[in-house]
Design a protein with these regions (language model features):
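Structured interface patches
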Residues: 1-166
Length: 166
């Protein structure tokens, strides 16, 4: 299945407990816009299945991407692979508002896959979990060098520092 056609027909599994409707597709990343992601190196790749478990439809699978990013703390560019585990409920009637809705026994796969991927993105993209960032004073990348800036003194201790300077 290509990203131009991302409807998955579930008619054959709706009334059959234990039935599965597998899928495998690629999604264009042209419409995804994240400030820290410079580019996606390839389309999002998704695979999995919608499973009927005792009349409850659940989409299970993964969606994965390779991205080229900019660190939100230090500005360094880095590559990151991200895989999101999918576990989304599918509504069989319109009364289930907090689930993804079917229309004419079909689900809109790109809506579910993009939504799951976007909601799982990190709020801040970091080159490494312990990134020290840049010095506010001189701009030195604290991951690689120490800065020579004088640390600001807490104003509550300023009087004591004046005594130490004498």
């Amino acid at each position: 299945m290509r990203y131009e056609d991302l409807k998955l027909n579930l008619r054959k599994i709706i009334e059959v407990p234990g039935a599965k409707a597998p899928f495998s597709c690629e999604l264009s990343t042209d419409e995804l816009d994240f400030p820290a992601v410079v580019r996606f190196d390839e389309p999002l790749k998704a695979e999995g299945a919608v499973v009927n478990t005792a009349g409850i439809l659940t989409l299970k699978g993964t969606v994965a991407a390779k991205m080229h990013c900019v660190c939100d703390r230090c500005g360094a560019e880095f590559d990151r692979e991200k895989t999101v585990e999918l576990n989304a409920g599918i509504a069989t009637d319109e009364s289930e508002e907090d689930l993804f809705q079917m229309e004419d026994d079909e689900i809109d796969l790109d809506d579910i896959l993009f939504t799951s991927f976007v909601f799982d993105m990190d709020a801040k993209m970091l080159c490494k979990p312990d990134c020290a960032g840049l010095c506010d004073g001189c701009g030195a990348n604290l991951n690689f060098e120490k800065c020579s800036c004088k640390k600001p003194v807490d104003p509550r201790w300023a009087v004591l520092e004046q005594l130490l300077d004498k």
